[in-house]
């Protein structure tokens, strides 16, 4: 199977997000990479589902709360930027202060 670097990045992101979801389901607080992976993955999936950039920017702030992450992680994540594929092309989605 031949994968482009972008496809490899998406698979790595999926794996990290899946791990984060499992840890969160067990009641563990997420660290920085897990939190960013989970937010990024949800944005990519939302784009795939047909949501708009504006909808994803808003929804990106509802994925995690301070209670979901380790101490200090919310302050470390100023913004999350993801290039997502929409029906009309690839767009950069930026979520400011995603962990509230």
UniProtKB/Swiss-Prot annotation:
Subcellular localization, as worded in the UniProt entry: Cytoplasm
Gene Ontology molecular functions: nickel cation binding; urease activity
Enzyme class: hydrolase
Reaction(s) catalysed (UniProt annotation): urea + 2 H2O + H(+) = hydrogencarbonate + 2 NH4(+)
GO BP: any one term: urea catabolic process
Principal cellular location given in the protein's record: cytoplasm
Entry's transmembrane regions: none
Keywords: Cytoplasm, Hydrolase
E.C. numbers: 3.5.1.5
One GO cellular component term: cytoplasm
Keyword Cytoplasm: yes
Pfam family, one: Urease_gamma
Pathway named in the protein's UniProt entry: Nitrogen metabolism; urea degradation; CO(2) and NH(3) from urea (urease route): step 1/1
CDD domains, per database record: Urease_gamma (cd00390)
Domain of life: Bacteria
Gene3D superfamilies attached to this UniProt entry: Urease, gamma-like subunit
Subunit structure: Heterotrimer of UreA (gamma), UreB (beta) and UreC (alpha) subunits. Three heterotrimers associate to form the active enzyme.
Protein family (similarity comment): Belongs to the urease gamma subunit family.
UniProt-recorded name of the protein: Urease subunit gamma
Species this protein is from: Chromohalobacter salexigens (strain ATCC BAA-138 / DSM 3043 / CIP 106854 / NCIMB 13768 / 1H11)
């Amino acid at each position: 199977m031949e994968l482009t670097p972008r496809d490899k990045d998406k698979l790595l992101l999926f794996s990290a997000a899946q791990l984060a979801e499992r840890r969160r389901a067990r009641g563990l607080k997420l660290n920085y990479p897990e939190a960013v992976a989970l937010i990024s993955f949800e944005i990519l999936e939302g784009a795939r589902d047909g949501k708009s950039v504006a909808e994803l920017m808003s929804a990106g702030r509802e994925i995690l709360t301070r209670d979901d992450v380790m101490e200090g992680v919310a302050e470390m994540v100023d913004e999350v930027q993801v290039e997502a594929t929409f029906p009309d092309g690839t767009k950069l989605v930026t979520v400011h202060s995603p962990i509230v």
